[in-house]
Amino acid sequence: EAGKGDSFGGLVVCAVGLTAENHDEIASTTICDSKQMNDNLILQLAPWLKERVAYHEINLFPREYNEQWLAHGSNVNTLLTDMHAGCIKKVAATGDYKSIVIDRFSPRLPVTKKLKTLSANTNIIEQPRAEEFLPVACASVIARATFLEQIKVLSQDVAIDIPLGSGRPVAAALENYRA
């Protein structure tokens, strides 16, 4: 996912399915966890990836994110569980995937529990830092690119440069917006 730790913007979740046919081509690129890549490279690679993989993403802008957060009991993990499971089910319907790898955000394995209706032949792995698996890295790149595009739209809407993250530039952006 992308946007979870940012002060501004919404939330984007993505799932990617790789096949034997596209795995090697993608593995030969510089794609890795989006946190280890610069944003310009992410924005260049995401469209290329989208042409080559099965993927589904859910892009919640701030208002919709806030509505969904409330609808999920003001619990971001419950919302993330539904978003991840929804994306994974859409991608799983596109092919015969033997394994599903999920970047774990809760020790209770909520996405695994939500996906129990998938094929008994599907191995579900939910672990922290799952971006070491290529499909999860690809999903992180696509989600980050979508989030960056979302921030660009929001910046244009309010006519200020909205900072990424949650650090020091956020306070200055809030002051500029109030002014």
Where are the predicted features?
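RNase H-like, Mg2+-dependent phosphodiesterase core
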Residues: E1-A179
